[in-house]
């Protein structure tokens, strides 16, 4: 069963209860791999313990960076996990490390830091009950170790991509008209505050002298707000909100575009869309200095700041230089080859095999 959880816009969250793990006794599992550290992660822990099999968990994203957008929800979630984890995992309590004398002097920034650290300590506490932990990026692994106290072996395993769909996609199949000489900036992501598409919309007035469109691909709660902001800024005719698209449609839109951009900051880890963009030969413009996987000087540009005008400066320079665009596009295709899904799958299978040997 499931219930509504208000942190992420009332998404469905699995409901677990004591005794649920027994229902899986009929299945002859060799290994358990959880992709979340919340209710289903706890269920995975219970099943692995009952069946005496290895438990691997993947930590996908920087959950605590949602504090700015969902402060009360994240705070309540941290409090709930601080109480629930010691009971569900039979572990020591994970208490916040804030000295009582400093609490009354905490400002907003200090409070966010304390909450973030507590979030990573809880995440690491879960991972420390597993046999292995996977992180898609080096910087996330370092946060887990330094801020969370992770001691379980952690493998950095970047996302892999089967590029077949992107190689076969044709720009000519796009429903979006593109005039000769016109350039397209594209962002593929859920339309929500943490993805910061508003920053890209606010870059567009600074590009009024260039024939350029911004295509925002994906559904989400911010769609209407983004449309209104484009109207206010007088760029609605150059900002296209596609809504939800199929994977095949996304591939076509990426093939048609000239630049991929993502404005999320200290939230994402190793977004799959970076790999998809690289597979289509798209240069990437981003602002989060902590993201490194799939981002090199050969295919990506890090902005000097995180605001719309910072992105606009990079866009204006890049879109006016066809030679640089071509060089970055070639570099993107080369980078994408390093993240072949078969290579990443083999590394994961090797980990599974090593764990199974250690259990028998």
Language-model features, listed with the residues they occupy:
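Acidic anion/phosphate-binding donor-loop and adjacent secondary structure
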Residues: 145, 161-176, 349, 359
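Short hydrophobic beta-strand element within catalytic cores of glycosyltransferases
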Residues: 274, 279, 283-286
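Short alpha-helical donor nucleotide-sugar binding micro-motif in glycosyltransferases
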Residues: 244-245, 252-257, 348
């Amino acid at each position: 069963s499931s219930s509504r959880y208000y942190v992420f816009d009332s998404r469905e969250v699995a409901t677990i209860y004591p005794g649920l793990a027994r229902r899986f006794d009929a299945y002859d599992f060799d290994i358990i791999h959880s992709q979340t550290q919340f209710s289903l992660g706890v269920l995975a822990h219970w099943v692995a313990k009952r069946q005496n099999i290895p438990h691997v968990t993947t930590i996908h994203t920087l959950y605590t960076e949602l504090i700015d957008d969902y402060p009360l929800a994240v705070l309540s979630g941290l409090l709930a996990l601080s109480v629930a984890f010691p009971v569900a995992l039979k572990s020591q309590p994970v208490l916040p490390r804030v000295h009582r004398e400093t609490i009354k002097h905490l400002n907003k920034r200090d409070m966010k830091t304390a909450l973030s650290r507590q979030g990573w300590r809880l995440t690491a506490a879960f991972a420390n009950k597993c046999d292995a932990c996977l992180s898609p990026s080096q910087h996330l692994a370092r946060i887990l170790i330094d801020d969370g106290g992770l001691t379980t072996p952690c493998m950095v395993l970047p996302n892999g991509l089967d590029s077949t769909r992107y190689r076969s996609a044709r720009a000519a199949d796009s429903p979006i008209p593109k005039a000769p000489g016109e350039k397209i900036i594209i962002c593929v992501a859920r339309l929500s505050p943490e993805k910061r598409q508003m920053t890209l919309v606010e870059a567009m007035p600074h590009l009024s002298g260039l024939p350029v469109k911004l295509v925002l691909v994906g559904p989400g709660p911010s769609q209407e707000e983004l449309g209104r902001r484009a109207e206010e800024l007088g760029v609605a005719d150059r900002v296209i909100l596609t809504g939800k698209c199929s994977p095949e449609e996304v591939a076509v839109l990426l093939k048609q575009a000239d630049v991929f951009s993502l404005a999320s900051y200290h939230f994402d880890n190793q977004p799959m869309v970076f790999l998809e963009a690289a597979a289509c030969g798209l240069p990437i413009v981003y602002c989060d200095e902590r993201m490194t996987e799939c981002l090199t000087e050969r295919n990506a540009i890090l902005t000097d700041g995180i605001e719309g005008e910072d992105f606009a400066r990079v866009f204006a320079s890049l879109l006016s230089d066809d030679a640089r665009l071509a060089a970055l596009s070639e570099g993107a295709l080369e980078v994408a080859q390093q993240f072949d899904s078969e290579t990443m799958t083999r590394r994961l299978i090797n980990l599974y095999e090593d764990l199974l040997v250690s259990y028998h």
